[in-house]
Amino acid sequence: MAMKKRILENRGSWNNRHANKKKPDEAVSKLPATIPTDIDGKRAYIEAWANENRIPGKIQSYFTVPVKPESCDWRILSQHLAKGNRVLSIEGPFKGAKPPKLVLDVDSQIRKPHLAKFRGSILQIWFRATGDGRFGIAVQNILHSAEATREFKTFLEYLEREHSGDVLCCHQIRVRPVQTFDPAHPAPGSHIEFRKGFGSRHIPIGGTDQKYNILDWTPACKAPWIGLSKRIREMIHPARGDRFLECFAGPAYIAESLSKDFEDCFAADVRLLERQTPGIRYLHAPIDKEFFPKFFRGKSKEGKWTVYLDPPDGKALAGGVIPEISACHPERIVLNTSNLAVATQEIKRFRREGYMLRKIVPIELSPGNPTIQALLLFVPDRAGLLGRGEERRGKVIRARENEKTGNETDSKPILFRQKGRR
């Protein structure tokens, strides 16, 4: 019995030795905890990210454009303090930016005694920049009294009289349910309507012929955004007969800017907002896994395609999107990402679907902010470099057989709608 007892004890101690054996420490990221704000620090950060995660693809030169405060969006925001008090404060595009004269003048004007009721109604004032020193203004306020309404009209007269050269329009907007509106992060289910004001709701984009709605999403700093389309053209080298699709398009500036370099250009976004995009065909649809098979179905969609993806806030693409895009075999896929952790996972997902990362172009769209943004160019792995033995087909997208394509004409826009979405 004593021998059996010792055997059992030894057996138990053997199991305990395995159970208590220390596991090797998990890999700890050596990247700095915070992203630097200067361009040299960002360049070093993205190189360290690529080395640490063994990211393939060539890192090209950083895309930067000098930024002036008058070419950026600004905001005067009403903030709540203790005991129900509120204060109006100026918010800029990046830390240390000096407000342009228009913003300072408006901030000073609304603090005058004869506009007290109007000032008390303000939730925020957006200064949407054109990129060439001019602005469109959107005032979100709640006019509860006739006196506040009269003072708002007085404010409009002030803008037309004193700032006719740099203010193209000013509109009051009302948001239901009541909440602070942000063009970059519109609340789902919110309803926005224009009320009183003057001028067009669409303002120019720099010196181009293109325009955007003052409620639409754009980067805060317009100068880098305006020059981005040229950098994308240099990155992908479009050939004659190629076609282009911009997803999460907003005002579709990229697609319109590149329309002369492609045979056809399309843009898609889920937001139903009035837009002026005469050079392209605009689709209102959610960018999900159902969108791409539906879009590429039909004879009119044959050819070599470049798909440009710019998901908001650095978010990952919706589930199933990458396999569906890859199944349509576009010639190029360009992903604009502002989240390197998400980008690492997206690169792996594209690899699994047979698309290899060819180029990395860091872009500086938010100067002075602790953010890193990059364009990632993916191309089909036709040479089998990813270790897959099968032949990579689909150099040219072809119409799927045995499917009804419907009648499509260039004169009619194509609308994709989903139940329950506006």
Predicted regions and their residues:
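Non-catalytic accessory regions of SAM-dependent methyltransferases
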Residues: 1-246, 255-309, 326, 330, ...
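A short, conserved alpha-helix within the catalytic core of class I
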Residues: 315-323
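Conserved glycine-rich SAM-binding loop
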Residues: 250-251
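C-terminal substrate-binding/active-site "lid" region of AdoMet-derived donor-dependent transferases
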Residues: 322-327, 332-377
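Glycine-rich nucleotide phosphate-binding loop and flanking beta-alpha elements
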Residues: 315, 341-342, 384
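Switch II (G3) loop of P-loop NTPases
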Residues: 312
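Short, well-ordered alpha-helical microsegments
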Residues: 255, 318, 343-344
